[in-house]
């Protein structure tokens, strides 16, 4: 019988990477190591230690062997830890009984002399003597050491082959110990675990979508899919009857699935939340499904029920035309759309605003915070809208693309933005309004949901009191948790999310090789930036700049750094894009090129400098660095300095006031900042700019007199003349160096593309910029405005779009900023029906963003699906981004060209790296580079030179490692484990260095993920059972009522048994059909416990020699094996030879785990714990239904029984009778406490029933409607 406390220790130990079993019995191997004669210090290794954070120690259970606790002396390290050291008794007598362990604060039974010596030496901190000291003889080889850092509480694993002194001085961190490389050794008993690594597969992630409960309307013109987890829950019954005209439905102006969304939204709007607000609805449809029409349908439905006023918020004013088109298309011609920004301040219904009494007011999020300077009663847009709606307003408010209304409610120290507060205030002031949120990434990013307070997920009457409670619960639980929230919302009828299937779409990855000259130029640029960084630092120190100024300066510096290298990356691809585009046009297709940013600001600056004259295309990259040096280099002008020194204090200094520079930053950041931000490079840039601007605004809002960046400690205003001179000189030198480099820097990508592809008359440009640089017939270069005689700038993009859709121009270039919501597909209604080829030069590194981008050319009602071309260079990580995006496209149904990605699918593409494993891997990488930690993997073998040394220099150059001035000690940047920052910054390293570093990061990530899998801590998102050949049966189901504010209200606990083995009969059936020369039965070369492994092998990819493997106990394996690996471990045999071994393992795996089968005993079983590794038949307990309503209860049980770290694993099942179940796996030891909790909360069940009855009294139409339906 296991004592209650032992669970805790086992959890803690396995968390630390120590196999709990090692504490209990002695493996033959281990015992052999504990020889009585002490070998020399060099060979002997320290005892295995697990360091617990202090507060865990009082919960330590009683253990059979001696436990020694040594308190760490505060002098040596700042971590409060206690080290638990494992000693294995090598005496002949048996173990002491488990009930009475010896726990003592002493050193183990080593010779007394040693003990004294060690104590004294520790007291005197005598390091040399300590190093000579031999460890006690009876200490076994370590398993691993783990140390919990107080700073972040996460347990990190360190390899245990550090010098012996480490343990004797209690894990003191010493710089001088060079980390020795640890080559992972495969122990023989690891092997059978491997086959169990992913016993649950990920099946296809999307399923074909059809409305289930609603049978009206025509089919959607294109195939639509939904994630499988959502498709396995059914929405509530429909009792609402829409008022939309038969004509609209019969003509298919609203398709069946758009009508479904309209109906559920209207039905949800009939219910109220516990706090009295009307419930809202979230449309999570992806790009191209027709969100616009669905919204128009909801507005129309309410208009017909005489709710004639509606508000529609979106990201750009251009989309107003789309809104009008959508309303017109569904037959709601009489509903007018008014732009909020065209109204004068004052009553909207007044005469001077055209007496607007009804219709839709269309506004952008930014216009919501508009304010008039002149005063008056309705001087803000918000007041205008509130007055127009009236207090009892029960019409529709639509928040379209609501994820774009950034930082509506940032969590943490930053304040919510004005826009965010306005959106919340609008909802709070109009509690009866019918709110609709629309966002394709609606429920994938929980933080984006902050302002969706009408969904009733948090607040009064829900498990989460505040939004922050909800966020904490969800983010702690990883990917799976968000899926549960989404499923729960669909169950309750408040969420719907479909995506256009990518069937028919093809994509290819074009690798652009970098020429020698380009790499040379790139490396030169890197060197210049490294020098610039040093000069900025030196100059700031010279003139003794203030902290605030430095912060602003570095914000600008890194923002420019990132943009500079982004531009260089993109420029390397221009030639290839031009070639490809010309080819595609020849083949009768048309081309769409996606860019993230336009570089307009640089062009304007160059123009200003040249007095309106240009003699060549402007180099955006050069402009970035030049403007940085000119505006933000800390070298004050002489004249300005004098004015600062008191001659005229009122003139603020251009170069020295961060307020100015922040304003400037805003100005130039207008285009470049925002576009680099949109590109998915969640960089340190945009955030810093924002925060620097805020902070500098706050600090300089006082009197200008008391703000001076050059004040020294004595508050005197004197800056040494000499220092200023030197700073000026540095600035001049930098600009000279830049001029030298500028000869090689590439020109503005957008202008070059347009020029190469035949000029503005052939290329439709849809971007946010106002002018462009063109080359004239005589070869001269000039700047011209984009606007044309008959077309105002506002609708220029729409005109250009029309020209493209009419076939006047066959090439379109779109920038991120201008493109949201624009449709460029080969529409059946458009003249230009050529197949679209969509090329992207810059992939965002989140797949969601990429899909959003591709939604421009892949939409409903198209004649042909587009082709995507990703252009990637060999710079750090671009291939990786491409494969992540490709992976997502494949799961949505797209096809690759040819078979070239078959190799990559075995590659790393399945790991998205912006997650906790990525951050963990990055932490290990960074720490190993500065010798704070030992590397998990060896550096890339083909790197010429000293990898760690070179990379260290490189990272110092890009500011991710800082050097302390006086001591020369290396420290890591505060955000050193921020993936986005890392990926952006390493672009500023020389080409071969960044590639090697990225490779090293990727290898480390693979190792981290493998470790997590081994320790059973890997969060795989949603897993599938019954997707392969397993047989899934329901053996029991318990139902529980749960309180809920609407019709939902129960959870079920299923007991599921899964049989996954393969009998000999089944195996021989497959074997009979095999044809390949290497197919057939194999036996393992290694014999363990007098047994061999039998497997059945089938070749699935002859070109790559990839084989599928079947095992007797676990059936078909997900992981394909390469032939070379197979040959190392197995030899081919005839079926008769395999028979005995196959049957033996098949029969024993019914109730014997792999360990017991191969070793004769299982450590876990000997403790009385259940071990299921390698079993043929497994039992799972799955909780489904409205899990969100009992979330806190489930959390409570899981935490109390299994410790806080148990992960929430979601599973998808398909039972033998075809039923689909999605839910949470409840660990076996949590089942009975959970059942008790759910069933004893009888009151809440009664309450739930009462709430339901009460609800039905309040909504009689639901009952009458039900009888009508």
From Swiss-Prot:
Phosphoserine, modified sites: 126, 178, 656-657, 661, 700-701, 1262
UniProt xrefs under Gene3D superfamilies: P-loop containing nucleotide triphosphate hydrolases
Keyword Electron transport: no
Protein's cellular compartments: Nucleus
Sequence segments annotated as region (Disordered): 21-47, 652-725
Gene Ontology CC annotations of this record: nucleus
GO molecular function: chromatin DNA binding; histone binding
Superkingdom of origin organism: Eukaryota
Coiled-coil intervals, chain numbering: 719-746
Sequence positions bearing N6-acetyllysine: 113, 377, 1098
UniProt record, GO biological process: negative regulation of canonical NF-kappaB signal transduction; negative regulation of MAPK cascade; negative regulation of neuroinflammatory response; positive regulation of canonical Wnt signaling pathway; positive regulation of neural precursor cell proliferation; regulation of DNA-templated transcription
Key words of the record: Acetylation, Coiled coil, Inflammatory response, Nucleus, Phosphoprotein, Wnt signaling pathway
Comp. bias regions, Acidic residues: 679-693
InterPro entries (UniProt xref): P-loop_NTPase, SBNO_Helicase_C_dom, SNO, SNO_AAA
Any one Pfam family match given in the protein's UniProt record, by short name: SBNO
Function: Plays a crucial role in the regulation of neural stem cells (NSCs) proliferation. Enhances the phosphorylation of GSK3B through the PI3K-Akt signaling pathway, thereby upregulating the Wnt/beta-catenin signaling pathway and promoting the proliferation of NSCs. Improves ischemic stroke recovery while inhibiting neuroinflammation through small extracellular vesicles (sEVs)-mediated mechanism. Enhances the secretion of sEVs from NSCs, which in turn inhibit both the MAPK and NF-kappaB pathways in microglia.
Assigned protein family: Belongs to the SBNO family.
This protein's name: Protein strawberry notch homolog 1
Organism: Rattus norvegicus
Gene: Sbno1
């Amino acid at each position: 019988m296991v004592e209650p406390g032992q669970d805790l220790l086992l959890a803690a130990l396995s968390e630390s990477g120590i196999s709990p079993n090692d504490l209990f019995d002695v493996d033959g191997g281990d015992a052999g190591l504990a020889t009585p004669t002490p070998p020399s210090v060099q060979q002997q290794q320290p005892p295995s230690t697990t360091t617990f954070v202090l507060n865990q120690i009082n919960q330590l259970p009683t253990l059979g062997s001696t436990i020694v606790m040594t308190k760490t002396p505060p002098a040596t390290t700042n971590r409060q830890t206690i080290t638990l050291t494992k000693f294995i008794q090598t005496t002949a007598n048996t173990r002491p009984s488990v009930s009475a362990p010896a726990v003592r604060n002493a050193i183990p039974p080593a010779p007394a002399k040693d003990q004294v010596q060690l104590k004294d030496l520790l007291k005197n901190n005598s390091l040399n003597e300590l190093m000579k000291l031999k460890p006690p003889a009876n200490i076994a080889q370590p398993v691993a050491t783990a140390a919990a850092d107080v700073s972040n509480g996460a347990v990190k694993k360190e390899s245990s082959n550090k010098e012996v002194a480490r343990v004797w001085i209690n894990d003191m961190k010493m710089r001088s110990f060079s980390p020795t490389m640890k080559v992972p050794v495969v122990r023989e008993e690891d092997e059978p675990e491997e086959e169990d690594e992913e016993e649950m597969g990920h099946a296809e992630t999307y399923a074909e979508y059809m409305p289930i409960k609603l049978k009206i309307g025509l089919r959607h013109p294109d195939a639509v899919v939904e994630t499988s987890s959502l498709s396995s829950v059914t929405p509530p019954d429909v009792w609402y009857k829409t008022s939309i005209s038969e004509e609209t439905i019969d003509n298919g102006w609203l398709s069946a699935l758009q009508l479904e969304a309209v109906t559920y939204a209207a039905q949800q709007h009939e219910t109220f939340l516990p706090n009295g607000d009307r419930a809202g609805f979230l449309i999570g449809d992806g790009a191209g499904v027709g969100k616009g029409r669905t919204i128009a349908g909801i507005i129309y439905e309410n208009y017909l029920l005489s709710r004639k006023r509606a508000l529609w918020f979106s990201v750009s004013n251009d989309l107003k035309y789309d809104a009008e088109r959508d309303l017109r298309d569904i037959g709601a011609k009489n509903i007018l759309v008014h732009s909020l920004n065209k109204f004068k301040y004052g009553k909207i219904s007044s005469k001077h605003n055209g007496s607007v009494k009804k219709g839709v007011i269309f506004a952008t999020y930014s216009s919501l915070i508009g304010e008039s300077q002149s005063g008056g009663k309705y001087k803000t847009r918000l007041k205008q809208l509130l007055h127009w709606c009236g207090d009892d307003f029960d019409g529709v408010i639509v928040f379209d693309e609501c994820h774009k209304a950034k930082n509506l409610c940032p969590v943490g120290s930053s304040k919510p933005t004005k826009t965010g507060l306005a959106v919340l205030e609008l909802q709070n002031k109009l509690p009866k309004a019918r709110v609709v949120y629309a966002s394709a990434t609606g429920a994938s990013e929980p933080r984006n949901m902050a302002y969706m307070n009408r969904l009733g997920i948090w607040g009064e009457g829900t498990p989460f009191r505040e939004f922050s409670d909800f966020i904490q619960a969800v983010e702690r639980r990883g990917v799976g948790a968000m899926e549960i929230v989404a499923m729960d919302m669909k169950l309750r009828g408040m969420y719907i999310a479909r995506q256009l299937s990518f069937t028919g779409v093809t994509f290819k990855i074009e690798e652009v090789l970098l020429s020698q000259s380009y790499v040379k130029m790139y490396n030169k640029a890197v060197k210049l930036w490294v020098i610039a960084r040093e000069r900025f630092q030196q100059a700031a120190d010279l003139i003794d700049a203030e902290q605030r100024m430095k912060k602003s300066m570095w914000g600008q510096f890194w923002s420019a750094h990132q943009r500079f290298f982004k531009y260089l990356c993109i420029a390397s691809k221009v030639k290839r894009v031009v070639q490809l585009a010309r080819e595609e046009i020849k083949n009768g297709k048309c081309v769409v090129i996606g860019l993230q940013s336009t570089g307009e600001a640089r062009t304007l600056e160059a123009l200003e400098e040249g007095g309106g004259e240009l003699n060549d295309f402007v180099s955006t990259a050069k402009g970035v660095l030049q403007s940085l040096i000119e505006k933000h280099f800390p070298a004050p002008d002489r004249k300005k300095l004098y004015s600062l020194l008191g001659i005229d204090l009122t003139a603020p200094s251009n170069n020295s006031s961060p307020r100015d520079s922040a304003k400037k930053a805003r100005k130039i950041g207008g285009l470049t900042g925002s576009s680099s931000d949109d590109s998915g490079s969640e960089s340190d840039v945009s955030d810093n700019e924002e925060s620097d601007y805020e902070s500098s605004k706050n600090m300089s809002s006082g009197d200008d007199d008391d703000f001076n960046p050059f004040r020294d400690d004595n508050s005197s205003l004197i800056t040494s003349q000499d220092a200023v001179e030197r700073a000026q000189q540095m600035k001049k030198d930098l600009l000279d160096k830049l001029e030298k480099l500028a000869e090689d820097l590439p020109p503005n990508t957008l202008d070059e593309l347009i020029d190469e592809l035949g000029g503005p008359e052939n290329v439709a440009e849809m971007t946010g910029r106002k002018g462009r640089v063109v080359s004239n017939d005589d070869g001269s270069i000039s700047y011209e405005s984009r606007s044309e005689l008959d077309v105002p700038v506002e609708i220029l993009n729409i005109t250009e779009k029309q020209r493209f859709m009419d076939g006047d121009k066959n090439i379109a270039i779109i920038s991120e900023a201008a493109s949201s919501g624009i449709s460029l597909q080969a529409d059946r209604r458009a003249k230009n029906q050529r197949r679209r080829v969509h090329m992207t030069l810059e992939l965002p590194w989140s797949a969601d963003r990429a899909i959003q981008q591709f939604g421009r050319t892949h939409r409903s009602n198209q004649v042909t699906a587009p082709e995507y071309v990703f252009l990637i260079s060999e710079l750090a990580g671009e291939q990786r981004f491409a494969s992540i995006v490709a992976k997502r496209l494949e799961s949505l149904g797209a096809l690759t060209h040819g078979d070239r990605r078959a190799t990559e699918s075995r590659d790393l593409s399945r790991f998205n790296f912006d997650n906790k494993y990525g951050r963990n891997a990055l932490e290990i990488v960074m720490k190993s580079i500065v010798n704070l930690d030992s590397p998990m993997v060896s550096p890339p073998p083909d790197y010429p030179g000293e990898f760690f040394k070179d990379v260290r220099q490189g990272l110092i150059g890009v500011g991710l490692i800082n050097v302390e001035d006086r001591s020369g000690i290396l420290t890591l940047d505060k955000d050193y484990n921020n993936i986005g920052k890392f990926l952006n910054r390493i672009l500023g390293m020389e080409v071969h260095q960044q590639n090697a570093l990225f490779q090293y990061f990727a290898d480390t990530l693979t190792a981290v993920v493998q470790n997590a899998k081994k320790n059973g801590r890997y969060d795989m998102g949603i897993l599938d059972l019954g997707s392969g050949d397993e047989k899934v049966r329901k053996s029991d189901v318990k139902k529980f009522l749960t309180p809920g504010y609407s019709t939902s209200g129960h959870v079920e606990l299923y007991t599921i048994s899964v049989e996954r083995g393969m009998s000999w009969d089944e195996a021989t059936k497959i074997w009979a059909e095999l044809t390949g020369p290497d197919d057939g039965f194999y036996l393992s070369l290694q014999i363990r416990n007098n047994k061999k492994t039998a497997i059945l092998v089938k070749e699935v990819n002859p070109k790559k020699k990839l084989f599928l493997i079947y095992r007797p106990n676990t059936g078909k394996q997900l992981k394909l094996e390469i032939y070379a690996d197979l040959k190392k471990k197995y030899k081919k045999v005839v079926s008769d030879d395999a028979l005995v071994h196959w049957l033996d393992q098949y029969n024993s795996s019914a109730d014997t785990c792999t360990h017991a089968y191969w070793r004769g005993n299982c450590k876990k079983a000997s403790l009385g714990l259940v071990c299921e590794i390698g079993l043929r038949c497994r039992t799972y307990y799955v909780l489904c239904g409205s899990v969100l309503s009992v979330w806190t209860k489930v959390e409570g049980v899981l935490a109390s029984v299994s410790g806080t770290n148990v992960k929430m694993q979601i599973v998808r099942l398909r039972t033998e009778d075809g039923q689909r179940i999605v839910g949470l796996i409840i660990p076996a030891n949590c089942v009975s406490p959970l059942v008790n909790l759910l069933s004893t909360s009888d009151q809440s069940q009664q309450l739930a029933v009462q709430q339901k009855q009460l609800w039905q009294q309040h909504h009689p139409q639901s009952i009458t409607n039900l009888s009508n339906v």
